[in-house]
Amino acid sequence: MFKVDLNSDLGESFGAYKMGMDEEILKFVSSVNVACGFHAGDPCVMDETLNLAKQNGVCIGAHPSYPDLLGFGRRNMQISFEEAKNYALYQLGALFGFAKAKGMKIQHFKAHGALYNMAAIDENLALALCEAVASFDENIIFLGLSNSAMNEAAKKKGLRYANEVFADRAYNDDGTLVSRKLEGALIHDENLAIKRVIKMIKESKVTSINGKEIDLKADSICVHGDNAKALEFVKKIKENLKKEQIQICALENFI
């Protein structure tokens, strides 16, 4: 039987600003990526997010970013190897404090936004992130874009790697994600998106925005719970995976 993880970004509210439908999305996913304060999230939000994850039996992961609250971590920054490593360690430590206090463990590490996209093509940046994870806890799974520089970096640092794919994003011919700034970056046809997800899991292939067949591996599918429509889409994905006899489970069960 095929196995796959469903992951979603959570804990992205900040102070008086609320973002996402965290409580609702937790009913459908097996892993969550918790914002660690650099792009979103704050101590109280992190505390509440972990409480919700624990109540729902969902595994948690660190979701670190460039230090970019105003830009929600979606703006690129030129930083050194040491800076990247230290930013990652700092944010891992923040999540670890709450996790330890609640008797929870960090299952995985997934970079956010521009940091994720850059680490997918910049092996030096990817190595800095992997070195941070390996020095913090070598049992943490590194979750990153399938067939990217992060995969190679994780191998070099002796980390387990989970290949991530996206249900609603278009791919370039080289396997990277089409920039959100470009037309066609997001797939709005839910039925098409679900067919693509099943193909990625069962055939390890996806069709690029230019019609090219790309090889990739799908260990985890990133889904979103920003609004009611997004939640319904996640529900449809889960229902269709079950119909296809694809088991949904957290990464720690098969990576």
Curated annotation (Swiss-Prot):
The keyword ATP-binding applies. One of its GO terms (molecular function) is ATP binding. Its EC number is 3.5.2.9. It catalyses: 5-oxo-L-proline + ATP + 2 H2O = L-glutamate + ADP + phosphate + H(+). Keywords: ATP-binding, Hydrolase, Nucleotide-binding. InterPro entries: Glyco_hydro/deAcase_b/a-brl, LamB/YcsF/PxpA-like. GO terms for biological process: carbohydrate metabolic process. The keyword Nucleotide-binding applies. Forms a complex composed of PxpA, PxpB and PxpC. Catalyzes the cleavage of 5-oxoproline to form L-glutamate coupled to the hydrolysis of ATP to ADP and inorganic phosphate. Belongs to the LamB/PxpA family. This is 5-oxoprolinase subunit A. The gene is pxpA.
